[in-house]
From Swiss-Prot:
Lineage: Bacteria, Pseudomonadati, Thermodesulfobacteriota, Desulfovibrionia, Desulfovibrionales
SMART domains with a match to the protein in the record: Adenylsucc_synt
Localisation per UniProt entry: Cytoplasm
Keyword Iron-sulfur: no
GO BP, one annotated term: IMP metabolic process
Organism: Desulfovibrio desulfuricans (strain ATCC 27774 / DSM 6949 / MB)
Gene name tied to this protein: purA
Protein name listed in UniProt: Adenylosuccinate synthetase
Role summary: Plays an important role in the de novo pathway of purine nucleotide biosynthesis. Catalyzes the first committed step in the biosynthesis of AMP from IMP.
Reactions listed under catalytic activity: IMP + L-aspartate + GTP = N(6)-(1,2-dicarboxyethyl)-AMP + GDP + phosphate + 2 H(+)
Length: 425
């Protein structure tokens, strides 16, 4: 038995959905353990593209159990929209194979309103939130006033919690942010109207995981966003509102850390970032535009154009340290075709010193100068390669250099969007 954690090793959008979809074939269950519908995982099978924001990417495999853990914040509307979308495509989304932890917190309308109001008030100092209420929902969780999925079975409890929440939220919306307050009865009615459809999906996720492990089945833990968006270890304050590191797979679905055997870091062959925040290797020239165009770098959730730049080995070394990555899945390697040369950032210059690690002080990463190592580019079309030895020598050299700089083996190489366009070493 080998349970596997999948995490993004950069700032998100590394191609986790495709790798989760592929590894799901070897697993009994796939579990989301953090984040919400601010993540967008894209899977392409036989030319058909599916984008999922909440439901685990393994749902496209008919015989797999898919679970949403307690560490996820769940928008009931988005969950049901995904259920309906998948059902219309013939995917089995019955409660027999899809479950939500009763401990998962629910994103409420006032969370979304607060998210948008705060971002609007920040003006030129925006964090880059998706406005989907993720942060405010996690705030209520930490303040011990949030609604959990299991509360839906008790309408009186729902009404009491909404009434308590709106005393504060409406004051903030109306008086501080100059936004319209929300109607208590309407909020309750909207949520309780969804309860009959949601309640069958509520379950004890920990119990499912324990039973599958007892039977010798493998579990795939699916992370969202990327390591450097982690609330504690990311480029604060330009981070998400949850822990995205591999260790949170344990807390986010209720299993002991000894159940986590393998950690696969998903690494894009270049680097991208959405929204604000430091990005040492960002390219604002034709190279950045080429990567964005060739890589179709627009957010699956927001549609926003992604910032693009060269691969940063300093960032990846930090990812290995934080998450204990056992191996790497290198994605979007085909996007680099036809660039005259390739560059990898191997160190930073900062205040007269050369650093091989990320400085921790807030704002410091914005002041570093990347130190690059240049490698030859390639013109060959690699999208049809099915074995590692089929790749051009220059491509194999690029991969080997990444392994040397990071200290972790590249076990998978993605050379196209399709499930089949993946080389396993």
């Amino acid at each position: 038995m080998a349970n596997t954690v999948i995490i993004g090793a950069q700032w998100g959008d590394e191609g986790k959905g495709k790798i989760v979809d592929m590894l799901s074939a070897q697993s009994r269950a796939i579990v989301r353990f953090q984040g919400g519908n601010n993540a967008g995982h894209t899977i392409k099978v036989q030319g058909e593209e599916t984008i999922l924001h909440l439901i685990p990417s393994g749902i496209l495999h008919a015989d797999k159990m898919c679970l949403i853990g307690n560490g996820v914040v769940l928008d009931p509307h988005v969950f049901l929209e995904e259920v309906d979308h998948l059902a219309a495509k013939g995917v089995d989304v019955s409660a027999a194979r899809l479950g939500i932890s009763k401990k998962a917190h629910l994103i409420m309308p006032y969370h979304k309103s607060l998210d948008k109001a705060r971002e609007a008030k920040r003006a030129s100092h925006k964090i880059g939130t998706t406005g989907r209420g993720i942060g405010p929902c996690y705030e209520d969780k930490a303040a011990r006033v949030g609604l959990r999925a299991g509360d839906l079975a008790n309408p009186d409890l729902v009404r009491a919690k909404v009434a308590h929440a709106l005393q504060e939220k409406n004051t903030l919306l109306r008086d501080l942010y100059k936004f319209d307050p929300l109607d208590e009865a309407a909020v309750c009615q909207e949520l309780l109207a969804l309860a009959p459809r949601l309640l069958p999906y509520l379950t004890e996720v920990e119990d499912h995981i324990q039973k599958i492990q007892a039977q010798g089945g493998d579990i795939l833990f699916e992370g969202a966003q990327g390591i450097h968006l982690d609330i504690d270890h990311g480029t604060y304050p330009f981070v998400t509102s949850s822990n995205t590191v591999s260790g949170n797979a344990s807390a986010g679905c209720g299993v002991g850390p000894s159940a986590l055997h393998r950690v696969v870091g998903i690494v894009k062959a270049y680097t991208t970032r959405v929204g604000s925040g430091p990005f040492p290797t960002e390219q604002l020239d034709d190279t950045g535009s080429y990567l964005r165009t060739q890589g179709h770098e627009f957010g699956a959730t927001t549609g926003r154009p992604r910032r693009c730049g060269w691969l940063d080995a300093v960032v990846l070394r930090e990812s290995v340290r934080l998450c204990g990555m056992t191996d790497i899945a290198l994605t979007k390697l085909d996007v680099l075709q036809n660039l005259p040369g390739l560059r990898i950032c191997v160190a930073y210059e900062y205040e007269g010193h050369k650093l091989d690690y990320m400085p921790q002080e807030e704002g410091a990463l914005e002041k570093v100068t990347p130190v690059y190592e240049d490698l030859p580019g390639f013109e060959e079309d690699i999208t049809g390669c099915t074995r590692f030895d089929d790749l051009p020598e220059t491509v194999r050299a690029y991969i080997a250099r990444i392994e040397e700089l990071v200290g972790v083996k590249v076990s998978m190489v993605s050379v196209g969007a399709e499930r089949r366009q993946t080389i396993v070493r």
